[in-house]
């Protein structure tokens, strides 16, 4: 969470990182960086960034820190690690799980779970030993690579919660010093990078899902009605975060308008 300042002061020329890390500076970073339970696929995130006002908001949000936001990518829809079958929203009641502090914890608490924050190095051991029964961790393929599915045999995929935006940003003075042709090359390069990395991750996710199912692991896929219900509950938490700053309110309004436009939220 220190790279924004490091890029702004020139200690670093740029960064590729999760936008949500900076939510301590302004809650708008959380609403723009990982709107929990909002999107179903990274292409929807890209549509919001490029055509729903997201890129412009992130550029405005980062400018006071001396940082120029070039564009965004995404991790892909994160899966969910679980030792017990969680097939609907109500199944989260009483489940002790690992989730990072912030909006994710707020939403899991709202649906009746008992989230705790654990350092990254302790998550696997906590799941293995039963300290927690589930964990908000990473994409399916990353969870697979780390061995989570050997100890937690009811992963939820596609995921139902997190899809972080990855921002590619540079020092504003360095950006302003570039000629227009190099700026255009970088902007298009970021778009190409975003599409490539998310497609690669999705293909690996699907391969690992197939491999795990062949081993008898139950990969839980929530029905649309439960995903929609999770999103509607999450809106209440988004609204709370929207009241914490002017930029957060603008981020919330832009996101919810876009989600209604693509049919992921009911029209008002």
Where are the regions that the model predicts?
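N-terminal secretory/targeting leader peptides
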Residues: 1-44, 53-268
């Amino acid at each position: 969470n220190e790279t924004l300042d490091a890029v702004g002061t020139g200690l670093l020329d740029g960064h590729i990182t999760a936008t949500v890390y900076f939510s301590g500076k302004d809650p708008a970073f959380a609403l723009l960086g990982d709107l929990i339970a909002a999107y179903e696929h990274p292409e929807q995130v890209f549509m919001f960034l490029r055509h729903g006002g997201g890129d412009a908001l992130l550029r405005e949000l980062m400018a006071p820190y001396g940082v120029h936001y070039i564009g965004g990518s995404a991790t892909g829809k994160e899966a969910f690690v679980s030792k017990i079958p969680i097939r609907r929203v109500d199944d989260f009641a009483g489940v002790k799980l690992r989730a990072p502090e912030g909006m994710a914890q707020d939403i899991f608490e709202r649906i009746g779970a008992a989230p705790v924050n654990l350092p990254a190095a302790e998550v696997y051991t906590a799941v293995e030993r039963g300290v927690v029964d589930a964990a908000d961790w990473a994409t399916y393929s990353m969870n697979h690579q780390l061995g989570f599915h050997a100890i937690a045999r009811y992963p939820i995929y596609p995921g139902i919660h997190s899809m972080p935006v990855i921002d590619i940003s540079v020092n504003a003075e360095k950006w302003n010093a570039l000629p227009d042709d190099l700026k255009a090359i970088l902007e298009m390069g970021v778009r190409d990078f975003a599409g490539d990395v998310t497609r690669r991750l999705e293909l690996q996710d699907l391969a690992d899902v197939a491999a795990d199912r062949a081993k008898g692991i139950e990969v839980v896929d929530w029905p649309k009605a439960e995903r929609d219900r999770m999103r509607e509950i999450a809106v209440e938490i988004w609204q709370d975060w929207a009241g914490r700053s002017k930029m957060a309110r603008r981020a919330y309004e832009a996101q919810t308008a876009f989600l209604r436009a693509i049919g992921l939220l009911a029209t008002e």
